[in-house]
Amino acid sequence: MATIMIGSMAISVPNTHVSCASNSVMPVQAVQMAKQVPSARGVLYTLKREGSTQVHKHEEALRKFQEAFDQDVGIQRRLLVNKHSSIQSTKKNGLTLRRLTLEQARAKEAAIARRKQEEEDFLNGKYEQQFYAGVSATKSMKFEGGSVGFRTKYWRPTPKKTKERRATSQCRKPTYVLEEVLSIASKSGKLVEFITGKGKRVKVCYVRKHGAILPKFSLPHEEGKYIHQELQYASTYEFLPYICMFAKYKSINADDITYGDSGLLFDERSSLTTNHTKLPYFVVRGRRNGKLVNALEVVENMEDIQHYSQNPEAQFFRGWKKVFDKMPPHVENHECTTDFTNEQCGELAAAISQSIFPVKKLSCKQCRQHIKHLSWEEYKQFLLAHMGCHGPEWETFQEIDGMRYVKRVIETSTAENASLQTSLEIVRLTQNYKSTHMLQIQDINKALMKGPSVTQSELEQASKQLLAMTQWWKNHMTLTDEDALKVFRNKRSSKALLNPSLLCDNQLDKNGNFVWGERGRHSKRFFANYFEEVVPSEGYSKYVIRKNPNGQRELAIGSLIVPLDFERARMALQGKSVTREPITMSCISRQDGNFVYPCCCVTHDDGKAFYSELRSPTKRHLVIGTSGDPKYIDLPATDADRMYIAKEGFCYLNIFLAMLVNVNEDEAKDFTKMVRDVIVPRLGKWPTMLDVATAAYMLTVFHPETRNAELPRILVDHACQTMHVIDSFGSLTVGYHVLKAGTVNQLIQFASNDLQSEMKFYRVGGEVQQRMKCETALITSIFKPKRMIQILENDPYILLMGLVSPSILIHMYRMKHFEKGVELWISKEHSVAKIFIILEQLTKRVAANDVLLEQLEMISETSERFMSILEDCPQAPHSYKTAKDLLTMYIERKASNNQLVENGFVDMNDKLYMAYEKNLLRSLEAGMARIKLVGKIFYNMAIEKICSTYGEMFDKESCRRKQRIFRKLCECVLHECPVTPKKCKKYTFPKM
């Protein structure tokens, strides 16, 4: 580019060269051409228009349905009657409507409308403001004469009686009723009685014999009475034709008549009548010299007659079966099959009969009278002597299923108090004393002297006297004021306890290992329900952390993998210590001012705490023994090479498993069933040591041999107020205190109310966590009907958790969960159904009040009623104990608040209740919002499905985009993938 200098400034000159334009044309490819893409706004408008059309159609259908519903006269009448009908209870604690007539319902509806109109008129000022002149009706004080009547206010005139005109019956023949009765009897087989002269009765029924329907008389020889003429023809001939009128005879020969045919009636249509009697009727009695005998004729020599009543065996079986079928057991849990022969059944029936009612002949009246005239003591001696005389037979009978219980019942009921000398000594020491305590001792001694013969009233009186003595003794106990910790020493025994069950050679195999026998087979009830299998191939890491309600503990199960390097092996012997607590008052237990050493923590010689050490794990063992070296017992060999660990909250099952070692083999089934069906449902997860000790005491009552059973080592965590029952997987966490109790008998001392100890309230876990789980399950299920039905069927007491908040009660009432609970439980358990009815009534009262504190006051007032009903309900559901504790808290809080108010103080927890209610409302609102959004999503899905069904399809790219948006929306709101049931990660929107 050229420049021009003007002075000192350089100015550029533009280029004057002009370039020529090119005439070449560039070709345009198909890819570069524009495409026609449908507008997204048009698609959305189409969807919106189709959605509006469908909504309009739906609203129009609802309007037509409502019009048809309102125009249906029958339905409106029923609704009107049900609206004004009152609710009344039935005899079976149910509820029903006491329906009014249509006129009564209309009258009530008119009265309500009239009252409402009057109120509206009054509020709108539609009334006349004027004065009314009149005379007041006052009684005159002046006495004047007058007539006095004797009619009271209850007098009513006697109504005139209307004479009823009875319709004249149609003229029928005199035998009409007789024929109708006999016709019914021939069809149903009912018994008919004819009363003849002098009060004599003749019984007739129709039976099927020899392929025919024949009349049958009840003859005296069938009841054991033998007379010359069993039926008098002169007194029965009048109704014999009518009896035969409804019989259906067939060709029956004389040879066909046999035992069981006594009393059969034949007329002249049968050859039996024409060939064997001169009378027009023949009633079978038997045979004499091969010829049939007529019961209507007189027979001189009755000894020659072979009577054709049923044989004695059939008669006996008929009576036995009749009573046997009337007295079946009340429990039916299977379908009966024929597993034994009739001979074996007869032996069993005879053995039971002769054990309770020993006679030489059941048909002998003197044998029965002999037992009848015996006194109770003589009868017991008679049974004992009879049992002693037939000892060998009893040894054989005991092999029959259930006969040993019969023998035990007899031995128990006939046992006598063998320690009469001791009872007489008590009488000698207490006689001539009239003080209350001596009289109570005398009443108790009288009941003990009688033994099994004591009556229920005497036992009740003795129990009351023993309770009174116990209360008196407790009130007079004194405690020492000496400083316990200065002198407290509780050294661990250096010697191991001796367990006779582990020393008996009969219970050990050739290797010296304990043989479980039947105990091992029945122990499956523990392992199947409360233990989980440890699979080594999946690793042990998920079992290392053992959580409890207030903390956690590490198991040494990981040390089952042994390193071959010495240095690493030595590192596996080092534990992880918790904060070591010194000996405090929470470590000791006292009763009557004295230490109860088995219920205290172990100390060294100088009084310092003995801390737990690392416990190495083992495979498939039960580890017992708290003093000395532990004892390792192989687990029952039911499933080879399987390892089990107790589920969280059920580690106390190791105590019951250790007790099973000492249980007799024939009682192992009863022991394991009682633990599974009675003990564990009441204890639940993480029970207190007080409850565990009480459960152990209940088991020792039925199985006394378990009192000296050795316990697994129990570690005490004072920081978390928890006790850990150590199993074969040991403990990597160290530094806990150690409980000294070594046997079940020592552990039972925790169950005493007199024991002063903090440790008996420690958890073997915690109730608060269980309660929070129940509340969360209830809140998340209110708007999910399927989950709520599962809760109502399996664990109905969770609904009592709704008492923590009036809002939860109101939402459950609106969702009609209480009505559903009544429907499910009214036929199963009335007590549970009654809980739902009271919850519904309480919610109606709570909803009528808007003040939170007054609503909570209503709930507290109803808690005692809930508690009384809950006592009668089944205790199997897991939430029973949690619900009971919640009601107990309300009852105790109400009592304490009432006492504070009486003393002039005020409850300061008002703001706490309001904050707690707000938190629950947030949870409920979140659930409601989620449900509403789900409804909208499903609604849009339905619209899209309708569009695709009717042919309005979209291109693939648009469909994929909609599916992707819908999936993201579900993930961020529901945290759940709509395609698969697997949980998705929570979605977070990207920042814009």
Swiss-Prot record:
Post-translational modification note: Potyviral RNA is expressed as two polyproteins which undergo post-translational proteolytic processing. Genome polyprotein is processed by NIa-pro, P1 and HC-pro proteinases resulting in the production of at least ten individual proteins. P3N-PIPO is cleaved by P1 and HC-pro proteinases resulting in the production of three individual proteins. The P1 proteinase and the HC-pro cleave only their respective C-termini autocatalytically.
GO molecular function: cysteine-type endopeptidase activity; serine-type peptidase activity
Record keywords: Host cell junction, Host-virus interaction, Hydrolase, Inhibition of host innate immune response by virus, Protease, Serine protease, Suppressor of RNA silencing, Transport, Viral immunoevasion, Viral movement protein
Keyword Metal-binding among record annotations: no
GO CC annotation terms, alphabetical: host cell plasmodesma
EC number: 3.4.21.-, 3.4.22.45
Motif mapping: Involved in interaction with stylet and aphid transmission: 361-364
Residues covered by the Peptidase C6 domain: 643-765
UniProt keyword annotation of Transmembrane helix present: no
Name of this chain's protein: P3N-PIPO polyprotein
Lineage: Viruses, Riboviria, Orthornavirae, Pisuviricota, Stelpaviricetes
